A protein has these predicted regions:
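Glycine-rich phosphate/pyrophosphate-binding loops
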Residues: 136-148, 242-256
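Phosphate/diphosphate-binding glycine-rich loops and adjacent basic-rich segments that engage nucleotide
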Residues: 149-216
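A generic, well-ordered mixed alpha/beta core segment in the N-terminal half of proteins
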Residues: 81-171
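Catalytic-core signal marking the mid-to-C-terminal active-site face
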Residues: 4-8, 13, 23, 249-355
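Active-site cofactor/substrate anionic-group-binding motifs, chiefly glycine-
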Residues: 50-103
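Small-residue-enriched flexible segments
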Residues: 187-249, 258, 263
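N-terminal glycine-rich anion-binding loops that anchor highly charged ligand groups
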Residues: 8-10, 26-50, 66-77, 261-265
Length: 355
């Protein structure tokens, strides 16, 4: 049976999440930024990275696995490169701070490449590349995650969902934004299905026997997109956001749930490009706007109403949710309203949140 869904205004949801995170121990400015990030995800229909995450974050914060007064340090290693040392702060705050250094270098030198070293989970990568595009930059972001995807031809999880996000500015109201896991689906989508008691497609994941499953509670390994192609991409992400920063790789990356009293030491990488160093900025943006226009004019295939550019459906969903309210599972809403910081559900679970 599916769970009841309620609809909240974005400011109400944002405030509920901020209050809970502050109660867990996060300082006000950090809690506000995380709540803003999670609201962005829920608005765009990516509920796997929205309010469903608050209880996990709160449990980790309360148990000491997130540095609540981090000693942030930016180490500039070259004219266009640097490493942001995050001190295992909550990743949403650390990654946004690191992004600002990268954007500054890209504005000055044409390119900015910043690695984020030793941080917590940073949420939805499209949040960051959206900011870059709003500042007239092209952006690529990659981030390692804990091992839950089986390699092509294998049966045991090795790499994470290892997402990739891309953005570019246009002369339209919104930029092009593309964000994807290198697995068929992100783990958070399965977590969202669990919270709503919904089945998943049998192409997303396998159980402990390596067989396809439709039960979100039986997932033991996620599948890479397009077999060997996704496998190669997730390895690339692991190299760029892990090994390149001297951090653990593959199956050695810490699990999200294994010990919530210690930092996760995750890595992330931003590559930011200033188009004006390669071409006229306005011509570049005009060309991308024309590209979108021509994609919209492409004859849709049977069963499709229109051809959309990558990420456009998220823009449409955001407009719908701003008008009609953000859908939230009743259990999540009840938790946000409760006096409980967390229900002690995640600590010492496996990668799939199972005890």
């Amino acid at each position: 049976m599916t769970e009841e869904i309620i609809y909240l205004g974005k400011e109400e949801l944002k405030q509920l999440m901020q209050t809970k995170l502050e109660k867990a121990g996060l300082q006000e400015t950090h809690a506000k930024e995380v709540a803003n990030h999670l609201t962005y995800a829920d608005l765009r229909g990516v509920h796997s990275h929205g309010a469903v995450r608050v209880e996990y974050y709160s449990e980790r914060i309360a148990k000491g696995g997130t540095t609540v007064t981090p000693d942030f340090k930016f180490e500039k290693t070259g004219p266009s490169t640097g490493v942001f040392h995050a001190d295992n702060a909550i990743g949403h705050v650390a990654a946004k701070e690191a992004l600002s250094y990268g954007m500054e270098m890209a504005k000055e030198t044409g390119v900015g490449i910043v690695g984020v070293s030793k941080m917590g989970h940073s949420g939805m990568l499209s949040y960051y590349v959206d900011i870059a595009a709003q500042n007239d930059l092209v952006a690529l972001a990659v981030c390692q995650s804990d091992p839950m995807a089986v390699p092509f031809g294998g049966t045991e999880p090795f790499f994470g969902t290892n997402p990739i996000a891309f953005s570019a500015p246009t002369n339209n109201e919104r930029p092009i934004i593309f964000d994807m896991a290198t697995t068929v689906q992100a783990w958070g989508k399965i977590l969202d299905a669990r919270s709503k008691n919904l089945p998943i497609p049998n192409t997303w994941a396998v159980d402990k026997q390596g067989e396809p499953t439709t039960d979100a509670n039986q997932v033991n390994g996620l599948l890479p997109i397009s077999g060997p192609k996704g496998y190669g991409l997730m390895m690339m992400v692991d190299v760029l956001s892990g090994s390149l920063l001297g951090l653990p790789f593959g199956k050695h990356v810490t699990s999200m749930y294994s010990d919530l009293s210690t930092g996760r030491n995750l890595g992330q990488l931003f590559i930011l490009i200033n188009p004006s160093y390669f071409t006229n900025l306005e011509v570049f943006k005009d060309n991308l706007s024309e590209m979108i226009k021509e994609l919209h004019e492409n004859q849709p295939a049977t069963g499709f109403e229109q051809v959309y550019y990558p990420g456009e459906l998220s823009e449409i969903k955001q407009a719908e949710n701003e008008a009609n309210g953000i859908p939230v599972a009743q259990s999540i809403y009840d938790y946000l309203l409760s006096d409980e910081v967390h229900y002690n559900r995640y600590d010492h679970s496996d990668a799939f949140a199972e005890k």
